[in-house]
């Protein structure tokens, strides 16, 4: 008799085991079939449990559904009374559970209906919404360095405003396009803000990729990306017409003689050479006929024979 009773108990326990799918189906049926208020303040009547069992797959009997319902009520009461410890999240120090928490967790009886099993996705909440300290530090963001900001200015001058993906891929490879766009927004807000003398210094005050950024920001036009020049240093050098050409003549030599003018006195001549009447070579304009009278410096007069 003892062996037969043990076998019967094991079979009943196996039949009473509820899977996660069974729990979900039971919860859906419980939400669809609202329990009528009992007259004596106790559990609902047998007819309601029979209707609830018909909505639960797996051929559960009304008695099994009743035990499962009572286990659920006990779990909810234990949680409301504070006898169930709250789940620990990443980064929090582990604390010993309060007294009676283990007994409350074990008091769910043979239904096997644990709150930590019921929430299913709630168990994923511990790993889904919570994150490690390293993940939290990464989400806080790492401040931009001056080198990254200068690379951003190079990319802004190259690809223009709005092409953050190209700037991220070709210049600021350590930042994502979203981070580049956020940095650009702060940069333009800083560029257009008022009261520049009163505000604190920031990396967004750097508006040029050359040395002396603070002076360049006050005297020259900052990089805005509206006109991509392809050469970041072109804005700092200025337009080609602003360059000054200084001609240095080594050795103190006189400047070269113009092409279409007469040779000055005592100046060596070169070019289209023809013999002059007085024996002095002169310069003729190219393409002119040789009958033009050359202009040369006067020769000393010949001595008169007496």
From Swiss-Prot:
Gene3D superfamilies: Homeodomain-like. It comes from Oryza sativa subsp. japonica. SUPFAM superfamilies: Homeodomain-like (SSF46689). Residues 89-142, 228-255 are annotated as: Disordered. A motif (Nuclear localization signal 1) lies at residues 133-140. A motif (Nuclear localization signal 2) lies at residues 196-200. It is found in: Nucleus; Cytoplasm. GO terms for biological process: positive regulation of DNA-templated transcription; response to gibberellin; response to salicylic acid; response to sucrose. Residues 110-120, 132-142 have a biased composition (Basic and acidic residues). InterPro entries: Homeodomain-like_sf, Myb_dom, Myb_dom_plants, Plant_Stress_Dev_TF, SANT/Myb, SANT_dom. Residues 18-73 form the Myb-like domain. Signal peptide: none annotated. Pfam families: Myb_DNA-binding. This is Transcription factor MYBS1.
């Amino acid at each position: 008799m003892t062996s037969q009773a043990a076998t019967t108990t094991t079979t009943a326990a196996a039949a009473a085991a509820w899977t996660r799918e069974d729990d979900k189906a039971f919860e859906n049926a419980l939400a669809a079939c609202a329990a009528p208020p009992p007259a004596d303040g106790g559990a609902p009547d047998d007819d309601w449990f029979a209707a609830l069992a018909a909505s639960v797959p797996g051929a559960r009997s009304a008695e099994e559904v009743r035990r499962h319902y009572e286990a659920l009520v006990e779990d909810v009461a234990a949680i409301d009374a504070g006898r169930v410890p709250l789940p620990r999240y990443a980064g929090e120090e582990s604390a010993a559970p309060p007294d009676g928490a283990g007994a409350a967790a074990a008091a769910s009886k043979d239904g096997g209906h644990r709150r930590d099993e019921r929430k299913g996705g709630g168990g994923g909440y511990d790993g889904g919404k919570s994150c490690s300290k390293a993940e939290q530090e990464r989400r806080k963001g790492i401040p931009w360095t001056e080198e990254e900001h200068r690379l951003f200015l190079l990319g802004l001058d190259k690809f223009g405003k709005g092409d953050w993906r190209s700037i991220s891929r070709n210049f600021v490879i350590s930042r994502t396009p979203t981070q580049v766009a956020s940095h650009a927004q702060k940069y333009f807000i800083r560029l257009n803000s008022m009261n520049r003398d009163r505000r604190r210094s920031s990396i967004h005050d750097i508006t040029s990729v050359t040395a002396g950024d603070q002076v360049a920001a006050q005297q020259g036009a900052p990089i805005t990306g509206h006109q991509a020049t392809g050469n970041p240093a072109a804005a700092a050098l200025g337009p080609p017409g602003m360059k000054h050409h200084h001609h240095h003549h080594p050795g103190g030599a006189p400047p070269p003689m113009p092409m279409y003018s007469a040779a000055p006195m005592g100046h060596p001549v070169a070019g289209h050479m023809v013999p002059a009447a007085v024996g002095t070579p002169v310069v003729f304009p190219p393409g002119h006929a040789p009958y033009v009278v050359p202009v040369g410096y006067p020769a000393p007069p010949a001595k008169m024979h007496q």
